[in-house]
Regions:
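Helical hinge/lid and interdomain linker segments adjacent to catalytic or ligand-binding clefts
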Residues: 30-35, 45-47, 51-144
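N-terminal secretory signal peptides that target proteins for export/translocation
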Residues: 1-5
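Oxidoreductase and adenylate-handling cofactor-binding alpha/beta cores
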Residues: 65, 156-161, 165-168, 187, ...
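Nucleotide donor/acceptor-binding cores
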Residues: 42
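Catalytic beta-strand/loop cores that center a nucleophilic Ser/Cys/Thr
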Residues: 29, 67, 73, 93, ...
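Extracellular ligand-binding/catalytic regions of CAZymes and related secreted enzymes
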Residues: 27-39, 57-58, 68-69, 228-358
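A glycine-rich, often tryptophan-bearing local segment used as a flexible ligand/cofactor-contacting loop or short
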Residues: 101, 110, 114-197
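Bacterial N-terminal signal peptides
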Residues: 9-22
Length: 358
C-alpha cells in the first residue's frame, strides 16, 4: 500500500512572482533550492527520525518555508528501513542516511530520538560540532542519540542533548495526550529578535520537564500546562506544576573538546501536530535566521507552501507500518502533500487542516 500523496495543480501552488521552484531529490535526501540561488545562500540540514512525533512530516514542511520564503537552501534527511530499504522508517534507530550533507551546512535542525548512527555517518556530526556551527533542537532532540558511541573523542551519543542543547531527557511535565502547553515570555527578553512576531505558542504535545539549564542559558519562553488539548484552553494558573513553569525555548552556548564555541536554540515543542501553530513555525524560522547571522523579520511569513496534514503523535508498534506506507522522500517534494490516518487509539483533535473530501 502506498501512502496517499496529494499532488497539487502546479498553477495552484506557484506563488506570485515565481516564488516556488522545483525540489530535487538526490538519493536518500530531499533538497529544496531557494528561488534565487547564489554563493551567499545559507544551507540548512534538517534531520528527521523519531518514533512518536512525526518529524518526517515536520521537516519537509519547515524546509519548504525556509527555502521558498526565506532564501535558504534546505536538505531534509530521513531514517530508512533496514537492509538498504528505500522507504522511510522512523522506527529504525540505525536508519539515518545522508549526514554527509552536514559538511556544507551552516545550520543543523534536528528532531531525532534515540538514534544510533554508524561511525561513518557520525563523523559528519562531529565535524559540524567541532566547527562550532549552530544547532536547533526540536522536542526529542534533547535525547537525539543513545549509546556510548562517540562524536569525536569525548562526546558520547547520550551526552548530545545535555552538552549541545543544554538539556537531556527528564520527563513529561503535563499529562501526555490530555494537557497541552502554552508559552509565556520570560521577563526581560521581550525584545529578543527570535520572539519577533511570536505571540502565543500552543503545543498539544505538552511541555517537558527541564532541570539542567544554567545561568549561561537564555530562557526565551516558558511553557504553562493547559486545561486540555484545545488550542484555546487556558493555563492552569493555580496548579503547582506551573510554579514555576518549565523552560519551553532557550538559547545555549556549547563547546566540545577540540571544537570552537557554538550556539544552539532548543524548544521542547516539536510534534508535527504542534506546528499547526503559526507562532511555533515563526519561532523556528526566526531562530534559523538569527543563528545564521541574518536579519530577523518583524513578522516572518510562515504560511504553508503546500498544505500540511500532520498526524497525531503516537508510538507505532506495528513493525510493518512504515513498510506498508512505503513513503519516499520525493513524496514530500514541492507540490506534494502526504496524508496518513492517525494511528489507532488516539484522541480526536479537530483543530488541524484535513484534505477536502472527494
Amino acid at each position: 500500500m502506498r501512502v496517499p500523496v496529494l499532488r497539487l495543480c502546479w498553477a495552484a501552488v506557484v506563488l506570485a512572482g515565481g516564488l516556488m521552484v522545483d525540489s530535487a531529490s538526490a538519493g536518500d535526501t530531499l533538497v529544496f533550492d531557494p528561488p534565487h540561488p547564489g554563493d551567499s545562500v545559507k544551507h540548512i540540514v534538517l534531520i528527521s527520525g523519531d518514533e512518536e512525533y512525526r518529524s518526517e512530516e515536520t521537516m519537509p514542511m519547515l524546509a519548504k518555508i525556509l527555502s521558498q520564503k526565506h532564501g535558504f537552501k534546505c536538505t531534509v534527511l530521513f531514517a530508512f528501513g533496514p537492509d538498504g530499504a528505500d522507504y522511510i522508517d522512523s522506527n529504525n534507530q540505525k536508519g539515518l542516511r545522508g549526514l554527509k550533507s552536514l559538511d556544507s551546512a551552516d545550520l543543523m535542525i534536528i528532531a531525532t530520538r534515540f538514534r544510533r548512527p554508524d561511525a561513518e555517518q557520525a563523523k559528519h556530526i562531529t565535524a559540524f560540532l567541532d566547527a562550532g556551527k549552530p544547532v536547533i533542537g526540536l522536542r526529542t532532540a534533547t535525547h537525539a542519540f543513545q549509546g556510548g558511541e562517540r562524536f569525536g573523542d569525548s562526546l558520547t551519543y547520550d551526552q548530545f542533548g545535555l552538552k549541545i542543547l543544554g538539556e537531556q531527557w527528564v520527563s513529561h511535565h503535563g499529562r501526555h495526550k490530555a494537557e497541552g502547553a502554552r508559552s509565556v515570555v520570560e521577563p526581560g527578553v521581550e525584545s529578543h529578535v527570535i520572539l519577533n512576531g511570536v505571540s502565543d505558542v500552543f503545543a498539544p504535545s505538552d511541555v517537558y520537564g527541564v532541570t539542567h539549564l544554567t545561568n549561561a542559558d537564555t530562557i526565551l519562553l516558558r511553557g504553562g500546562i493547559t486545561e486540555s488539548l484545545d488550542p484555546e484552553s487556558k493555563i492552569l494558573a493555580y496548579d503547582d506544576r506551573n510554579k514555576p513553569m518549565q523552560p519551553f525555548a532557550w538559547l545555549h552556548p556549547y563547546t566540545i573538546p577540540n571544537g570552537k564555541e557554538g550556539r544552539s536554540f532548543c524548544t521542547t515543542a516539536g510534534a508535527s501536530l504542534d506546528f499547526v501553530d503559526e507562532d511555533l513555525r515563526r519561532l523556528v524560522v526566526n531562530a534559523s535566521v538569527y543563528l545564521t547571522g541574518g536579519q530577523v523579520p518583524e513578522k516572518a511569513d510562515v504560511g504553508y507552501v503546500d498544505p500540511f496534514y500532520p498526524t497525531f503523535f503516537s508510538f507505532i508498534n506495528d513493525k510493518d507500518y512504515y513498510k506498508t506506507m512505503n513513503m519516499k522522500p520525493e513524496d514530500f517534494g514541492l507540490g506534494k502533500t502526504p496524508h496518513r490516518p492517525d494511528p489507532p487509539g488516539n484522541p480526536a483533535w479537530p483543530f488541524r487542516p484535513v484534505p477536502e473530501a472527494k
